[in-house]
Amino acid sequence: MNQEPLSILHLIANASLLVQAVMLLLFLASMVSWVMIVQRGLYQSKARSAYNAFESLFWSGTDLTQLYRQGNTEANRNTIEGVENIFRAGFKEYTRLRQQGSTDPDAIMEGTQRAMRVALTREEEKLEGNLSFLASVASVSPYIGLFGTVWGIMNSFRGLANVHQATLATVAPGISEALVATAMGLFAAIPAVLAYNRFSANAESLTTRYETFSEEFSAILHRQVHAKQS
């Protein structure tokens, strides 16, 4: 008795059109997820390195005005990431309010802290970019795969109506085709959920470090503005 090989490609090629559409959707979701996983990993790694480098420079005793001016050059402007954007936003607003002749230290600090909060929110959004898509793929893909499996199994049993004697050899190919959809759903979901959890934790950790820096920088500016008033 000649049996057709049950290879993955053979099963996909012989699946129904709807099951093939489900498999194609899951394959595309998996590919897009991997692209986003690589991009997010590279971006967060770059943001972490930028934070460590800038923090070392900031606490090295460099004059704040000089540190701000270093970022004004064209070469450095394209490399500014993460915490340095928060520093620049706060120091720019602090300098602007001082140059306007504002004598109220609380008003100066309020404006400075507001500018840093806005910059912090933007950096947080950058860190969490594409995470919602990964979460969607992680949560929805298994159900899409299950839908393809259920549909494929229904077709397999429907085909038994035209068979005089149902055997395992008759049903197995159709069920195998259907189960490939579930496997592809898990293949798309598992990397997405692992990446989402890791990148969410990384984003939360970096955001906490950004917030800590903002508070420390605010304390430095607070001492400066009150020292100049006294």
Where in the sequence are the language-model features?
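Hydrophobic alpha-helical transmembrane segments and adjacent short intramembrane/lumenal linkers
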Residues: 164-178
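Alpha-helical transmembrane segments
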Residues: 27-47, 146, 153, 188-203
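Internal alpha-helical transmembrane segments of multi-pass membrane proteins, especially GPCRs
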Residues: 13, 17, 23, 129-139, ...
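Predominantly long cytosolic amphipathic alpha-helical stalk/bundle segments
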Residues: 49-144, 155-167, 194-230
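Hydrophobic alpha-helical transmembrane segments of polytopic membrane proteins
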Residues: 178-192
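Hydrophobic membrane-targeting segments
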Residues: 1-56
